Amino acid sequence: MSNKLTFQEIILTLQQYWNDQGCMLMQAYDNEKGAGTMSPYTFLRAIGPEPWNAAYVEPSRRPADGRYGENPNRLYQHHQFQVVMKPSPSNIQELYLQSLERLGIDPLEHDIRFVEDNWENPSTGSAGLGWEVWLDGMEITQFTYFQQVGGLATSPVTAEVTYGLERLASYIQEVDSVYDIEWAPGVKYGEIFLQPEYEHSKYSFEVSNQDMLLENFETFEKEAERALAQGLVHPAYDYVLKCSHTFNLLDARGAVSVTERAGYIARIRHLARSVAKTFVAERKKLGFPLLDDASRVALLAED
């Protein structure tokens, strides 16, 4: 490709494009999480009747995927560009393809395929109809219409577009290793992230204190429940995220059996569902303030 955008130029281009489509530009949420979907800007805002259009970069940590910086495409932490639009625009796939054009990828000159891959996140009680988007044989995006989030049916339906920024940048810059991606002029991805990749992998697989992590999970779970009992949705959800990341560290360390693993996931799911239900109830008390007046009156009148 002739237009070899840097990593940060890819982000800037996507931000400008989705801003032009009416999305608010949010910032990465300051808690560890395994995917951009787990940000409250997606998880919480995808439920309930209020409209929501947002785009943001989300660093996503997956301890079990760490490879000490030795694998060119497998990472402890990668970056997602997350777009959520609710209600889903009827032309969302067309908007997505136009975003690729902004990045210098002409859909007419490349093999772009939507491969069915329905999505599910057992830890949060979430699922949806989905597709992987393949560009010349490489997955670059996950496309999902949420049907359920936090155990609640979504109405209206939220569309989520999740770009894998490292894969996208590798393709645009024509490099085989993520560590060779140019983040900014003269600065390679590896110069920023290779050492953290090694250290986090070593910590996740060899060094982490299992007893401490087990104790932390119990503490975070109790604190989430305590916050929820006071109607404090956002602090409670922060602790759900902490539970999730702590479990992922335990899983990477091999500290939980297959049976225990299912139990931990069920506990996180129970918390996530409680948070989701409480969030909608709290928004209802506020009169669903993001709805227009006519929709609000009609919705509240139904009750």
Curated annotation (Swiss-Prot):
CDD domains: GlyRS_alpha_core. InterPro entries: aa-tRNA-synth_II/BPL/LPL (IPR045864), Gly-tRNA-synth_heterodimer (IPR006194), Gly-tRNA_ligase_asu (IPR002310). One of its GO terms (biological process) is glycyl-tRNA aminoacylation. GO terms for cellular component: cytosol. The keyword Lipid metabolism does not apply. Its main location: cytoplasm. It holds the Pfam family tRNA-synt_2e. GO terms for molecular function: ATP binding; catalytic activity, acting on a protein; glycine-tRNA ligase activity; transferase activity. Coiled coil: none annotated. It is found in: Cytoplasm. Belongs to the class-II aminoacyl-tRNA synthetase family. PANTHER family: GLYCINE--TRNA LIGASE, CHLOROPLASTIC_MITOCHONDRIAL 2, GLYCYL-TRNA SYNTHETASE. Tetramer of two alpha and two beta subunits. HAMAP family: Gly_tRNA_synth_alpha. This is Glycine--tRNA ligase alpha subunit. The gene is glyQ.
